[in-house]
């Protein structure tokens, strides 16, 4: 039984899907104006792992993750680069797909783009105005937060608490608002900006409305899980809830999940602090699976500290798991012990997708395998566990028949033909195969 920590209720809750054996997930994707950094990648990897575990347990997952392809940051970066916002966003969407593929992230069921949903966004805003949840002011449209019952319930704050923090704002946009907390659903166009015609004049969508529209258009008024980084809890997800539930009158998402930050020297990795490294840069020197494994070593809600040592440790541990998978099969293994490993793994992952505990089970199982318990069922179970973490090793085509050469070497040794035996060992070593002579016979692994 899978239990999820739901940010809305601040509690572990049994997962009950809206539709039996199906999970509908929406995860906020990147604003595509630059390469993603390791902190951004954590969200992609964390929710991919969650998706994979749902699939491991037999669920069909509809996994939707958007691309924000129109935004203030995109417009600014496109202007600086001398290209259109679409050209810039297309470039970095391609880069995102390439980077996350290297991290073993499965393609989403759909990756909706904001620019493809402008008509639906306008219709959504019109509906909110009709219901008196929104109002037009000088070409902008704002959401009335005071009309939203339990606004900011996700952030566990009251409207009065938030109003205190907003009371000192004096910018031009705030002057148009009925309440400083009211947020933009539609922004009037500025000279030279990308824009679309609407009942309120030329403009473009506000950030928060985009995800509400794409999520409900694709998955319906209520979805099972909405996810994203912890920094999206307020205001982004808070505003999504307010506008979505105002329009439909229904619960927007049954479970809210938020991943923790990647930190550097215990500070959040971010572009604004300048303490970030992009995935694109890291992949020049570090294998994508190593980065993936590093990001999986901590339970998704907890922060994870990025250090060279942590990456080095991930590389060593990944190599150990690969060598374990490449052990020769044995004839027997304790079926009950195998069953216990599978149960322990599921218990760990059922507990809010605790990858740290799940990986501990994987290494305990690897130790057991390396002690001589590696039948085909054991191998299959082990590979399925690793696949949950996105660890999938492709079968390498050998130029030699390893087992045949080992048998030939054993025969040479029995005949005291040590020159031939040594030559075979050298031949295997050239193929990256290391031989281990044990009291139970010869074992081999890839070096």
UniProtKB/Swiss-Prot annotation:
UniProt GO molecular function: ATP binding; cysteine-tRNA ligase activity; zinc ion binding
An individual GO BP term: cysteinyl-tRNA aminoacylation
Gene Ontology CC terms: cytosol
Subcellular location: Cytoplasm
UniProt keyword annotation of Transmembrane present: no
Pfam families named among the record's database cross-references: CysS_C, DALR_2, tRNA-synt_1e
CDD domains registered for this protein in UniProt: CysRS_core (cd00672)
Keyword list, A-Z: Aminoacyl-tRNA synthetase, ATP-binding, Cytoplasm, Ligase, Metal-binding, Nucleotide-binding, Protein biosynthesis, Zinc
Motif 'HIGH' region, residue numbers: 30-40
InterPro entries for the chain: Cys-tRNA-ligase, Cys-tRNA-synt_Ia_DALR, Cys-tRNA/MSH_ligase, CysS_C, Rossmann-like_a/b/a_fold, tRNA-synt_1_cat_dom, tRNAsynth_Ia_anticodon-bd
Top-level taxon of the source organism: Bacteria
Residues at which Zn(2+) binds: 28, 211, 236, 240
Details of cofactor binding: Binds 1 zinc ion per subunit.
Annotated binding of ATP, by residue: 271
Swiss-Prot/TrEMBL catalytic activity: tRNA(Cys) + L-cysteine + ATP = L-cysteinyl-tRNA(Cys) + AMP + diphosphate
Motif placement: 'KMSKS' region: 268-272
Keyword presence, DNA repair: no
E.C. no: 6.1.1.16
Cofactor: Zn(2+)
PANTHER family according to UniProt: CYSTEINE--TRNA LIGASE, CYTOPLASMIC, CYSTEINYL-TRNA SYNTHETASE
HAMAP family cross-referenced by the UniProt entry: Cys_tRNA_synth (MF_00041)
Subunit structure comment from the entry: Monomer.
Family: Belongs to the class-I aminoacyl-tRNA synthetase family.
Identification of the protein by name: Cysteine--tRNA ligase
Organism: Streptococcus pyogenes serotype M18 (strain MGAS8232)
Lineage, opening ranks: Bacteria, Bacillati, Bacillota, Bacilli, Lactobacillales
């Amino acid at each position: 039984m899978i239990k999820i920590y739901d940010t809305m209720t601040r509690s572990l809750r049994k997962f009950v899907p809206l539709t039996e054996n199906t999970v509908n997930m929406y995860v906020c994707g990147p604003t595509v104006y630059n390469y993603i950094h390791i902190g951004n990648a954590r969200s992609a990897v964390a929710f991919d792992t969650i998706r994979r575990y749902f699939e491991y347990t037999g669920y069909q997952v509809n996994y939707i993750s958007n691309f924000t392809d129109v935004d203030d940051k995109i417009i600014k970066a496109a202007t600086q680069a001398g290209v259109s916002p679409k050209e810039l966003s297309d470039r970095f969407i391609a880069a995102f797909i390439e980077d996350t593929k290297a991290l073993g992230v499965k393609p989403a069921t759909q990756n909706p783009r904001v620019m493809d949903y402008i008509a639906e966004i306008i219709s959504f805003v019109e509906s909110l105005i009709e219901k008196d949840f929104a109002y037009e002011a000088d070409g902008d449209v704002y959401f009335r937060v005071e009309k939203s019952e339990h606004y900011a319930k996700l952030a566990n704050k009251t409207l009065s608490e938030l109003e205190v923090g907003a009371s000192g704002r004096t910018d031009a946009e705030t002057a148009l608002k009925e309440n400083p907390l009211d947020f933009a659903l539609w922004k009037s166009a500025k000279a030279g900006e990308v824009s679309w015609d609407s009942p309120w004049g030329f403009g473009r969508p506000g950030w928060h409305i985009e995800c509400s529209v794409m999520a409900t258009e694709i998955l319906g008024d209520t979805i099972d899980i909405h996810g994203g980084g912890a920094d999206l809890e307020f205001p982004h997800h808070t505003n999504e809830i307010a506008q979505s539930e105002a329009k439909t009158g229904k619960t927007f998402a049954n479970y809210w999940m938020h991943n923790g930050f990647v930190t550097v020297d215990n500070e959040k990795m971010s572009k604004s602090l300048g303490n970030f490294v992009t995935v694109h840069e890291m992949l020049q020197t570090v294998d994508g699976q190593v980065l993936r494994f590093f990001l999986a070593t901590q339970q998704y809600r907890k922060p994870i500290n990025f250090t060279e040592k942590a990456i080095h440790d991930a590389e060593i541990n990944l190599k150990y798991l690969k060598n374990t998978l490449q052990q020769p099969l044995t004839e027997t293994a304790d079926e009950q012990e195998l069953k216990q490993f599978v149960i322990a793994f599921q218990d760990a992952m059922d507990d809010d997708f605790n990858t740290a505990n799940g990986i501990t089970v994987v290494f305990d199982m690897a130790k057991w395998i390396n002690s001589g318990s590696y039948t085909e069922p054991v191998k299959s179970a082990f590979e399925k566990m690793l696949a949950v973490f996105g660890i999938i090793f492709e079968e390498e085509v050998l130029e030699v028949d390893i087992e045949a050469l080992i048998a030939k070497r054993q025969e040479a040794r029995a005949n005291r033909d040590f020159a031939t035996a040594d030559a075979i060992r050298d031949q295997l070593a050239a193929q990256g195969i290391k031989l281990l002579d044990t009291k139970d016979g010869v074992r081999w692994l890839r070096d």
